[in-house]
Regions:
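Predominantly extracellular beta-rich ligand-binding scaffolds that present long acidic/polar faces
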Residues: 1-79, 177-180, 184-480
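Short, surface-exposed linear motifs at loops/turns and structural transition points
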Residues: 74-189, 212
Length: 480
């Protein structure tokens, strides 16, 4: 109610004026210029931090001049923007506000963003967004609405927008559907954070590939403690790249996340022990790091890298000459922390030429940080040396940090040695750090390398053992 005791400077608005879609107009009409502070941002959707307030049950009012980072309603409303997934059995799931029907089982074959309705849309929708420095207007045709089941209908946003190669400096992109403006990030699953998100969801092969493609641009936008949280299993071989991928073609090569010393990986990736399957891992042509991650200076937790029904390889592309390179399945080099991670089924291949140094390991190429509870099964580590220095180990090519409670199963082979120096070991090709409570079962083959069952007698080892002379690998599921 209202009356003589209203606070000075306030104007009464009844329920109808503040509910549903009318609230965007009401905020402009009744608040007028109440928010005039310049904060360097664009138009915004305000974020209601007060529990129990009426506005929390509806879309947030649109305010101008305030930087905005979170766009999702507190309560789901039909006829709004949602994140959606398509599964191998033909079913759909979506996430919007407090409504979620996405699954943690089965295989995701496609994902994206779109408008969801509880009945068939009555008319076509006009969509406006910026792309390539120009304003684009497109139409979502009601005749193309997809029956998602459960009484919901989906009109997907244009693929050119969902798979844009542009990275917004505000992290979120703006899209206007009819008279409503939304902010979202098409490269990942939706975030509910009011500011630059402290946690970003990774759910599909497209999203993990986007992290590889655009990490260099996203890295300076995110706080150092930002967590990239994997929320379900990811399978590259089962994803429908033709209909949902960036280029419409199957991903045959993925570069490391944090692919150089200029832009290393500095954040937190938590795999949640969900498998990541069938990723074709290659360095950039002439790059110094190869693996799922390149140079890790952040934290990798609970990452399980597998190959599915066939073996895949980690490859160093280009000619390695007069420089140092690092190759491993999980990471090329670790200067940060790795905890409770596993890799299985990835062969590692590289060749070293004049004046170069190559560190190769089944798990990481080189460790200068801390690794605890790491495991790897490598069908083959294969390399050659031509007047170069080559250091190979079933677990890591070199270690100057700490490795504990870890093990490796591998088949390590040097094809050719011409000059230079080659060290071949079951666990670590070089060790000037510390290795604790770890073991390996490794077959070593070399025409003339310095060969060690576990690691060279340098550095420190404690409670470690090795088994050599056979061929070993995991079979079946990987359990952490």
């Amino acid at each position: 109610s209202h009356g003589d005791h209203d606070m000075d400077g306030t104007v009464f608005a009844d329920y109808e004026q503040w509910s549903g879609r009318s609230r965007a107009d009401a905020i402009e009409k009744y608040l007028n210029d109440a928010f005039t502070a310049e904060t360097g941002g664009s138009d915004t959707v305000a974020y209601n931090l007060v529990d129990g307030m009426g506005l929390g049950a509806y879309s947030y009012p649109r305010l101008t001049g305030l930087t905005h980072y979170g766009d999702w309603q507190a309560q789901f409303e039909a006829g709004t923007l949602v994140y959606y997934e398509v599964y191998s059995d033909g079913s759909y799931g979506f996430r919007g506000a407090n409504k979620s029907t996405v699954k943690t089982t089965g295989t995701v074959v496609g994902d994206g963003y779109g408008m969801v309705y509880s009945t068939l849309p009555e008319q076509d929708l006009t969509v406006r967004y910026s792309l390539g420095g120009r304003e684009v207007t497109s139409t979502l045709y009601r005749a193309n609405a997809i029956d998602m089941g459960g009484g919901y209908y989906l009109l997907p946003l244009p693929r050119t927008l969902v798979n844009t190669t542009e990275v917004s400096t505000d992290f979120y992109r703006r899209v206007q559907v009819e008279d409503t403006t939304y902010y979202f990030n098409p490269h990942f699953t939706c975030s509910e954070a009011p500011e630059a998100p402290s946690e970003i969801g990774i759910r599909t092969a497209r999203q993990l590939n986007n992290l590889s493609l655009y990490y260099e641009q996203y890295s300076p936008l995110l706080a150092k403690d930002t967590t990239l949280q994997q929320e379900r299993s990811i399978d590259y071989s089962g994803y429908d790249w033709a209909n949902y991928g960036r280029s419409g073609a199957v991903v045959t090569s993925q570069q490391p996340i944090g692919s150089s010393a200029v832009v290393p990986f500095t954040h937190i990736y938590d795999g949640g022990t969900y498998p990541i399957a069938a990723v074709p891992l290659q360095s950039p042509n002439g790059g110094d790091y190869a693996g799922l991650f390149g140079l890790n200076q952040g934290s990798l937790r609970n990452v399980v890298l597998t190959t599915g029904e066939q073996d895949y390889s980690v490859t160093l592309r280009g000619i390695l000459r007069l420089r140092t390179a690092y190759v491993g399945a999980l990471a090329g080099r670790n200067d940060g922390t790795v905890y409770n991670c596993a890799a299985a089924g990835y062969s590692v291949t590289a060749h070293a030429y004049q004046g170069s140094v190559l560190y190769m390991g089944g798990f990481v190429g080189y460790n200068a940080g801390t690794i605890r509870s790491g495991s790897v099964s490598t069908p083959s580590l294969t390399a050659s040396s031509n007047y170069a220095r080559l250091l190979m180990g079933g677990f890591t090519g070199g270690n100057s940090g700490l490795v504990s409670q870890s093990y490796a199963m591998a088949n390590v082979e040097v094809l050719q040695i011409r000059g230079g120096g080659v060290a071949l070991s079951g666990f670590a090709g070089e060790n000037i750090g510390s290795i604790r409570s770890s073991y390996c079962a490794t077959a070593l083959t070399s025409p003339g390398a310095d060969t060690y069952g576990f690691a060279p007698a340098t550095g420190s080892t404690s409670g470690c053992c090795y088994l050599s002379g056979g061929t070993y690998r995991f079979v079946g599921q990987v359990h952490l």
